[in-house]
Amino acid sequence: MRKLFALIIAILYISVAYAQPRAVFMGDSIFDSWDSTKHGGHPQFFKNNNFVNCGKSGEVTAQMVARFQRDVIDRNPDCVIICGGTNDIAQNKGYVPNRLIMKNIKTMTKMAEQHNIEVILCTILPAARYPWRPEIEPVKPIRNMNRRIARFAKHHHRKFIDFYTPLATKHGALQTPLSKDGVHP
C-alpha cells in the first residue's frame, strides 16, 4: 500500500495546500479503502496533502461518469487520478463491453480537460478471480483494458500510472502477500 502512495506522490508536484484540493482520486473500492483506517488506509495522508478521495466501492465506470461533475469538476482540483473498470469486468451491473468502459474513461478525461484539470489515468489492478463473481474470468479482459488505457494515455499525452505490472503475478493475479481477497491491495 505504501508503494502505491509513494508512486502517486512521485507523480504529483509539491505545492502549498489551499482551498481547492490538489488532487481528487476518482475510482472504485481500490481507492475507497485508501483513506479508511478500517481497511488499512491512511486518512492523514489525504488530509495532509489536500487530496480528496472519491472512490466508491462496487461502482462501475458509468456510475463514475454520473458523479464526475459533482465529485471532481465542482471541486476544481489541480488534477484527477482515474482508476476504474474492474467492477465493469466483474459485471456488477451487467455485462459491459471493453469499448464502453473505455468510452466512460474517455468521457471523464474530456470533462476534466474542458475544465483545465490535469488527468492521470491508471491501469486496472490485477485479479485472477472475483470472490463475489467466481464465474467471471477477468485476467484477459483486464489485460485488454490496460492495453487500451495505456494506448489512450500515450496517444493523448496523458500521465499514466501502471499499477498492474508491479502488482501482477505472471498469471495475472494480484500478488498474494498484497491482498486478502485477490482484488484489493
Predicted regions and their residues:
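Catalytic nucleophile-elbow at a beta strand-turn-alpha helix junction centered on a G-D-S/GDSL motif
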Residues: P21-S36, K56-V60
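Conserved beta-strand elements of the Class I
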Residues: V24-M26, V52, V80
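Sec-dependent N-terminal signal peptides
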Residues: L4-Y13
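Hydrophobic residues at beta-strand termini and immediately following loops
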Residues: M26, C54, I161-F163
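Residue-level detector of flexible, active-site-proximal loop/helix-junction positions
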Residues: I11, I30, G58, P126, ...
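Alpha-helical cap/lid subdomain in secreted, periplasmic
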Residues: G41-N50, Q63-P185
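Sec/Tat signal peptide C-region and signal peptidase I cleavage site
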Residues: S15-A19
